[in-house]
């Protein structure tokens, strides 16, 4: 509770004022870090999912189970929740044994490498999940614009056809936010082509205009592109 224990340095007025400044767009603003980073429970999958849901970021478990990084790690087409839960539980148990007791047997090096690999991939899944939710929210509030949807992809060279939305503009070197099914990335536009002609910039004047674009990496069919206003 505020004003007790580890939170005795806080008071209700300062906490409310800090959040009001942040939500009102005041600059600079400050987060109440005590509320953000302190948690009594080990962050197992259900705890993480619950934390995200309380922030309005729903369906994390479904996102994680279908993400390519989890599919690659577990070598399954769709990863059961139990597989991710058990992986996290095993690491939490290992950490607890090391912190609060004695480990009878040292963990195999390959197991440690596998655990580290999982953590790296899982953190990237979390980053992409939050980024996707953020982009969707920013678009709904008019802070970014939708460029259109990819209707044809030419593979790993990064070239694709975008069916663009009226009113948007695209310029070489633009940073675009790319939302695919269970994946988020950001890339820069390397080239723009219309009717075989290379362009430096293009203003979209008609709905469903098709324009050729190229990014450094593969952009798949049905991906939706956004950019800052």
What annotation goes with each model-predicted range?
Residues 49-97, 105, 109-141:
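Amphipathic, Lys/Arg-enriched alpha-helical patches that create a basic surface
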Residues 5-6, 10, 136-142:
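Noncatalytic linker/hinge segments flanking ATPase motor cores
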Residues 1-77:
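Helix-loop junctions and short alpha-helical segments
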Residues 4, 76, 82-83, 196-198, ...:
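Sparse, context-dependent recognition of short Cys/His-centered cofactor- or disulfide-binding micro-motifs
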Residues 100:
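Histidine-centered active-site/metal-ligand motif
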Residues 142-170, 175-229:
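Beta-strand/loop-dominated core regions that host nucleotide or nucleotide-derived cofactor-binding catalytic loops
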């Amino acid at each position: 509770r505020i004003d007790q224990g580890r939170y005795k340095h806080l008071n209700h007025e300062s906490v409310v004022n800090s959040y009001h400044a942040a939500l009102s767009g005041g600059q600079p603003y400050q987060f109440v870090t005590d509320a953000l980073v302190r948690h009594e429970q080990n962050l197992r999958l259900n705890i993480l999912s619950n934390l995200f849901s309380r922030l309005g970021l729903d369906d994390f478990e479904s996102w994680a189970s279908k993400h390519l990084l989890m599919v690659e790690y577990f070598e399954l087409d769709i990863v059961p929740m139990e597989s991710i839960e058990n992986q996290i539980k095993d690491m939490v148990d290992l950490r607890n044994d090391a912190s609060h007791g004695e480990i009878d047997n040292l963990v195999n090096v390959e197991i440690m490498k596998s655990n580290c690999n999982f953590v790296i991939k899982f953190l990237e899944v979390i980053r992409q999940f939050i980024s996707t939710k953020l982009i969707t929210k920013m678009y709904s509030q008019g802070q970014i614009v939708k460029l259109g949807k990819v209707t044809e992809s030419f593979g790993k060279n990064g070239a694709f056809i975008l069916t663009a939305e009226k009113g948007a503009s695209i310029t070489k070197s633009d940073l675009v936010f790319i939302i695919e099914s269970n994946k988020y990335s950001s890339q820069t536009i390397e080239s723009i082509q219309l009717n075989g002609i290379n362009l430096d910039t293009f203003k979209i004047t008609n709905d469903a205009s098709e324009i050729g674009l190229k990014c450094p990496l593969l952009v798949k069919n049905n991906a939706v592109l956004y950019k800052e206003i």
